[in-house]
Curated annotation (Swiss-Prot):
UniProt GO MF annotations: NADH dehydrogenase activity; oxidoreductase activity, acting on NAD(P)H, quinone or similar compound as acceptor; quinone binding
Localization annotation: Cell inner membrane
Protein name (Swiss-Prot/TrEMBL): NADH-quinone oxidoreductase subunit H
Domain of life: Bacteria
UniProt record similarity statement: Belongs to the complex I subunit 1 family.
Record's function text: NDH-1 shuttles electrons from NADH, via FMN and iron-sulfur (Fe-S) centers, to quinones in the respiratory chain. The immediate electron acceptor for the enzyme in this species is believed to be ubiquinone. Couples the redox reaction to proton translocation (for every two electrons transferred, four hydrogen ions are translocated across the cytoplasmic membrane), and thus conserves the redox energy in a proton gradient. This subunit may bind ubiquinone.
HAMAP family: NDH1_NuoH
Bilayer-spanning residue ranges: 20-40, 92-112, 127-147, 165-185, 206-226, 268-288, 294-314, 329-349
Catalytic activity of the protein: a quinone + NADH + 5 H(+)(in) = a quinol + NAD(+) + 4 H(+)(out)
Keywords: Cell inner membrane, Cell membrane, Membrane, NAD, Quinone, Translocase, Transmembrane, Transmembrane helix, Ubiquinone
Length: 357
């Protein structure tokens, strides 16, 4: 990273230390935010393509080569539509709610490491920051349901808040277990900790990642992430056959699109977190020269893409759960299981067979 040191020294000489710090932080935010927004846009394209292939259809194939410009067509369509605010709605909160849903999903990327040194803010409490910032998103859903002054929207918001809080608990127990085996809240340290051990010393890095010893927690995390993002088969929040579009029923135009941007941004974020917590983050699966030449951010992207594709596969394969079934799964199965596994791992770490030393 010699060129970064040269750029930093030249920037400080030109603008001064304080001004350069502000400018450099803004540049890093743009470098992270723009690709994330593009990934969100093209995730909608990949979802339609993948479901189309699973249903033996073509999917989007008209706008641009193989339909690659379809996300831009969708954006232009939504930009030209009017944002209709209901006459009885709380207008300020009605407009603020979609923004509150999207912003935490983007702000959480500040501590996500794309490589050993490629991170916007390498803070020691990175995992705690992600858990805290992502929990704010539920407020946008609640505010949208209340501000719309609609029965359908309010019912959807009530469902959403209960479901998201329930599965946040399961995810929190999973992340606490990862914290226990890693011994650090720093995201970089969590990734580096998965590169140590008997298998890693012999080049089989993928067998030293947390997915193998914590496999039940990995499965619970992925399913809970699907429920946390209100994705099918846990999308009773916006169950079309029951409450139309849930908390989004009164929204249109770009305000409506912001909710979907937030949903897909959360999908990518939780998939990236799964890659960092369980799949070795930016590390290559096998410690050999050709694979080690590939930049870490590409490995992180490949693993994140794999987990995101699981979200889409679930949508195309499983029927929607009833609301009572979703809550029973979260409170009576996942939360007790994660709590028990946390105790099991804690005991395991005190035995001579501790593999995380």
């Amino acid at each position: 990273m010699e060129w970064l040191n040269v750029l930093e020294s030249q920037g400080q000489a030109l603008l001064g230390p304080t001004a350069w710090l502000v400018v450099w932080t803004i540049i890093k935010i743009v470098i992270i935010a723009v690709p994330i927004i593009l990934c969100v846009a093209y995730l909608t394209y990949w979802e339609r393509k993948m479901i189309g292939w699973m249903h033996v259809r073509l999917g989007p194939n008209r706008v641009g080569f193989k339909g690659l410009l379809q996300p831009f067509a969708d954006v232009f369509k939504l930009l030209t539509k009017e944002v209709v605010v209901p006459s009885q709605a709380n207008k300020i909160l009605f407009i603020v709610a979609p923004v509150v849903t999207l912003m935490p999903a983007l702000a959480a990327w500040a501590v996500v490491p794309f490589g050993p040194e490629a991170v916007l803010a390498n803070v020691n409490a990175g995992l705690l920051y992600v858990m805290a910032i992502t929990s704010i998103g539920v407020y946008g859903v609640i505010v949208a349901g209340w501000a719309s002054n609609s029965k359908y929207a309010f019912l959807g918001a009530l469902r959403a808040s209960a479901q998201m809080v329930s599965y946040e608990l399961a995810i929190s127990f999973v992340l606490v277990t990862v914290l226990l085996v890693s011994g650090s809240l720093n995201m970089n340290e969590i990734v580096l900790g998965q590169g140590r051990g008997w298998f890693a010393e012999r080049g089989l890095t993928f067998l030293s990642w947390n997915w193998l010893p914590l496999l039940p927690l990995f499965v619970i995390y992925v399913i809970s992430a699907v429920a946390e993002t209100n994705r099918h088969p846990f999308d009773v929040v916006e169950g079309e056959s029951e409450i139309v579009a849930g908390h989004m029923v009164e929204y249109s135009g770009m305000a409506f699109a912001l909710f979907f941007l937030g949903e897909y941004a959360n999908m990518i974020l939780l998939s990236a977190m799964a890659s960092i917590m369980f799949l070795g983050g930016w590390m290559s699966p096998i410690d050999i020269a050709p694979l080690n030449w590939i930049p870490g951010w590409i490995w992180l992207g490949i693993k994140t893409f794999f987990v995101v594709s699981l979200f889409i596969w679930f949508r195309a394969s499983f029927p929607r759960y009833r609301y009572d079934q979703i809550m029973r799964l979260g409170w009576k199965i996942f939360i007790p299981l994660t709590g028990v596994w946390l105790v099991v791992v804690a005991i395991w770490m005190q035995t001579p067979w501790n593999i995380w030393r």
